[in-house]
């Protein structure tokens, strides 16, 4: 069995692909798995680290700005697309995969499109509530389309072969809250707020936390991933504090989730898959510049199901937002209800189910 995965640009597209690939290898040790990506996306480093071979293509997405540099880069897009289609044609001719799997991002477009043109089975996995342009186009000819949200069906112009499977996510070890709080040297009797905004961080969230730090620490424990861009400056200003653990990155995310009574974070698809898998109540602050504002719609899906509180990026620094979060963190019954609602939305078996569908497509040919 030979499979080709394509998805990249951001971790939200790459890591689901890696999770599916690893699950397939767990049951199909002889499967040959390759990836297609770009040298500028996170996949260029993340995929080889997992031991998978990588084909690089020159495709690039359309820039949404209007600066001279961005306009110039957009002029190159058609040429890069044509070169990428040609490269993907050659890859498919040479490798002859049984199935091609696309997990989103512009990089998945050329290889999945070429595979469909050659009648090679294709499977699309979409992470976001509002599917991107690439997914909508490729879904028309895909063998199967796997979605993470029920409401995503309204954007897919077909009903057969469409499944709401959930978003593949990494697996976490289970820990008792007291054990996890002790890991971060925090008071086991206090409510704990977990704040994170990705590897780079989220400046608006960081500023909202730091501006009221004394008040947060007076009442709660705080586990705070600042991201690497703001960490040095924040560390210089605040030093070490009681009831506070902070760093640029959280390596032991399983411990952080276990310690947390409430999470404040962005609304990327992978993050939401993790918090619903674990049944964590959350305050979601969508990144306002995400493509097609997809983080807002991701967050709205949880908020509409009373599993999360949605606060827009422009409002996270307001006094009313701080008061609302603090009130929520002290409301045990509401946290419990949100946790139950979050867990209902979780799809912990997504990785296994999608892997099984890929294997079946490969066997059917």
UniProtKB/Swiss-Prot annotation:
Transmembrane segments: none annotated. It is found in: Cell inner membrane. The keyword Chloroplast does not apply. GO terms for cellular component: plasma membrane. Coiled coil: none annotated. UDP-N-acetyl-alpha-D-glucosamine binds at residues 10-12, 128, 170, 199, 250, 295. Keywords: Cell cycle, Cell division, Cell inner membrane, Cell membrane, Cell shape, Cell wall biogenesis/degradation, Glycosyltransferase, Membrane, Peptidoglycan synthesis, Transferase. The keyword Transferase applies. Pathway: Cell wall biogenesis; peptidoglycan biosynthesis. GO terms for molecular function: UDP-N-acetyl-D-glucosamine:N-acetylmuramoyl-L-alanyl-D-glutamyl-meso-2,6-diaminopimelyl-D-alanyl-D-alanine-diphosphoundecaprenol 4-beta-N-acetylglucosaminlytransferase activity; undecaprenyldiphospho-muramoylpentapeptide beta-N-acetylglucosaminyltransferase activity. Cell wall formation. Catalyzes the transfer of a GlcNAc subunit on undecaprenyl-pyrophosphoryl-MurNAc-pentapeptide (lipid intermediate I) to form undecaprenyl-pyrophosphoryl-MurNAc-(pentapeptide)GlcNAc (lipid intermediate II). This is UDP-N-acetylglucosamine--N-acetylmuramyl-(pentapeptide) pyrophosphoryl-undecaprenol N-acetylglucosamine transferase. It comes from Chloroherpeton thalassium (strain ATCC 35110 / GB-78). The gene is murG.
